């Protein structure tokens, strides 16, 4: 009798590399920041007033959306008290920034009153004006296979569905002080990531998915301008993933370096607590200056990072000694 050998098929499947929009956006903003954060695992917490205030508004909007979705009365008294108490904490945490004017000419105190007096009612008013819409997603979580190698995961702030046409409207809540420029609305990568998620979540084709930013502090919404967001964005996403695969981590030096958590000038504690996270290629641009691309050290290659960082730290310590 002949022997039959059965070979089991291997079940070892390589897990997908998980990405969020914020992670791929970090690489797009600055490849070296991506390396420090995600490749080298230097996770630093960097609080700022914009993030704290934005998170608070998101929380209130989420509570209102759940009340509407569940056909429950919206307790504005409770929500306003919560908002006021949290704003007081923010004002105590950022006593200068809370009363400084932003590029819209308003302070956070003024934006607080604006939200309390009018913006807080926007979602309820919107739903009353559009009875054909229902809320189908609130902080809607998702995860999907992007290309067989990478997956995207995250959450969508808010999603509506037109009960007549089946169309999905994705809203991302932004507490921007002023609306975005048109150039920023052409095929935003964030919406491409969300549209691919929406297709799988609600079984709706791309041509029946619309995306827009909801701006409660500007009392408006802004729709993405591209007619085919996913097709326009995929080449960009593929190029970003290719850059990561090829370990192209050359820094992008801009005015945004001023707010970066890896900039030792604006986050000096990392010099002592986590020197391996110091970016030696940061821009010396400051709020009162215009030297956007002045840097202490010019980028050479990855092999020079440790030496450049050591030199950068020694120079900064010398500056501190001279000041003291």
Language-model features: locations:
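Nuclease catalytic cores
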Residues: 24-69, 116, 139
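Accessory/regulatory regions of helicases
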Residues: 1-10, 258
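A non-catalytic, helix-rich entry segment at domain boundaries
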Residues: 60-138
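Short helix-capping/linker segments at secondary-structure and domain boundaries
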Residues: 43, 65-74, 130, 201-204, ...
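Mg2+/Mn2+-dependent nuclease catalytic core
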Residues: 133-239
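Metal-dependent nuclease catalytic regions and adjoining charged, substrate-binding loops involved
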Residues: 77, 181-183, 196-324
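A residue-level signal for conserved active-site and pocket-lining positions in enzyme catalytic cores
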Residues: 30, 57-58, 158, 211, ...
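Short amphipathic alpha-helical segments and their helix-coil junctions
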Residues: 11-14, 31-44, 170-176, 238-245
């Amino acid at each position: 009798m002949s022997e039959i050998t059965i070979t089991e098929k291997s079940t070892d499947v390589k897990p997908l590399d998980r990405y969020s929009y914020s992670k791929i956006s970090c690489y797009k903003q600055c490849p070296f920041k991506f390396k420090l954060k995600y490749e080298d695992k230097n996770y630093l917490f960097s609080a700022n007033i914009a993030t704290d205030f934005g998170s608070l508004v998101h929380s209130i909007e989420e509570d209102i959306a759940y009340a509407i979705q569940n056909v429950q009365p919206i307790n504005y008294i409770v929500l306003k008290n919560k908002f006021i108490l949290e704003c007081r904490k923010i004002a105590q945490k950022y006593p200068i920034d809370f009363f400084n004017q932003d590029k819209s000419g308003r302070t956070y105190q003024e934006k607080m009153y604006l939200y309390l007096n009018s913006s807080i009612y926007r979602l309820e008013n919107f739903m009353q004006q559009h009875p054909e819409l229902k809320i189908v997603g609130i902080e809607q979580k998702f995860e999907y296979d992007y290309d067989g190698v990478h997956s995207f995961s995250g959450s969508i702030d808010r999603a509506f569905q037109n009960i007549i046409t089946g169309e999905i409207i994705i809203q991302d809540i932004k507490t921007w002080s002023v609306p975005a420029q048109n150039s920023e609305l052409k095929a935003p990568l964030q919406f491409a990531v969300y549209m691919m998620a929406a297709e799988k979540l609600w079984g709706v084709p791309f041509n029946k998915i619309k995306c827009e930013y909801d701006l409660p502090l500007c009392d408006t919404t802004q729709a993405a301008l591209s007619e085919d967001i996913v097709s326009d964005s995929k080449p960009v996403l593929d190029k970003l993933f290719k850059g990561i695969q090829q370990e192209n981590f050359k820094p992008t030096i801009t005015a945004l370096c001023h707010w970066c958590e890896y900039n030792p000038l604006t986050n000096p504690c990392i010099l002592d607590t986590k020197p391996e996270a110091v970016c030696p290629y940061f821009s010396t641009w400051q709020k009162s200056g215009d030297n956007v691309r002045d840097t202490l050290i010019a980028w050479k290659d990855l092999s020079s990072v440790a030496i450049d960082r050591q030199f950068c730290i020694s120079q900064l310590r010398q500056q501190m000694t001279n000041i003291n």
